[in-house]
């Protein structure tokens, strides 16, 4: 019970930080744009939904490793990630190039590669 509350709280804090990035920062949504941003070396953090296809997930992780970029595995599916981003469509991957006013890059524990 306690672990479920803590997990819900961390999801809400990640969602609030994502909303702040959407308002004040720069980002790329989608698989192709994320790969393009990683190849250019502009991405600071990559967020992948839980139900992303394994091949795409491993490919993004590989490019992030080469670019020395942090990867966070979002605990919700792509519909929940899209909702957290304030979009009405599904978002499987998301690359943050400029966090803006948000401290999402420094606060995510799994983001260090």
Curated annotation (Swiss-Prot):
Alphabetized UniProt keyword annotations: Ribonucleoprotein, Ribosomal protein
PROSITE patterns on file: RIBOSOMAL_L30E_1, RIBOSOMAL_L30E_2
Cited Gene3D superfamilies: 3.30.1330.30
Organism of provenance: Spodoptera frugiperda (Fall armyworm)
Domain of life: Eukaryota
An MF annotation (GO) of this entry: RNA binding
Protein name stated in the entry: Large ribosomal subunit protein eL30
Family affiliation: Belongs to the eukaryotic ribosomal protein eL30 family.
GO cellular component: cytosolic large ribosomal subunit
SUPFAM superfamilies noted in UniProt: L30e-like (SSF55315)
Stored InterPro entries: Ribosomal_eL30 (IPR000231), Ribosomal_eL30-like (IPR039109), Ribosomal_eL30-like_sf (IPR029064), Ribosomal_eL30_CS (IPR022991), Ribosomal_eL8/eL30/eS12/Gad45 (IPR004038)
